Amino acid sequence: MTKRFPTPDYHFSYRIPPVSGNTINGLGETSPRRARQVFHGSGARKLEWVALEMFFGLTMPLHIFIRNALNRWELRKADGPLARKRTPVPDSAEMSKQIKSIAKQAGAGAVGITPMTEDALFEGQTADYQTAIVIALPQDYETMKAVTTVKAAAETVDTYRDVSRIVMALAAHIRSLGWRARAYGESADLLHIPLAINAGIGQLGKH
């Protein structure tokens, strides 16, 4: 009796065939398009690598997992109600100075303001705001030199939490003036790097 085997391209071990990173990143495509979310999705669409992200989360040490979960919980305050009365802004340059000052008082290391651009949006998203306020926060240099250690991982998660707290406080202040504002403490909703470059905070690394 002749044995019959499935062809090599038959995905007999997957309910959903895996998608490579090259495919997600558009390797070989000739037309420009927006980026697609890979990890830490906002929930706008099901991510191809969601199982790997879950594995990554479940394998981290418990105290780091808890810190990360707390950050996600705190980000529920990213948006909120507006003040009933809107404060006029006759001088946008002066207001920009005030916003930057408030952000630095809250702990930001650097602050920049830039228009929202197409390259900061993931595929399928729309711009809810015309302007982005971008902050940067330094990390402990000596700790991050050992980036693969648990201590460095804790420093990274703590920095995420610090950034979230700063931008949530800043957004709450803007809403208290009667203007819409939402805090984006993580990169699940927006691409932070293009905005940071446009805001004058830094430049794209070559690594």
Label each residue range with its predicted role.
Residues 1-113, 123-128:
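Iron-sulfur (Fe-S) cluster-binding modules
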Residues 93, 100, 104-207:
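Catalytic cores of enzyme domains
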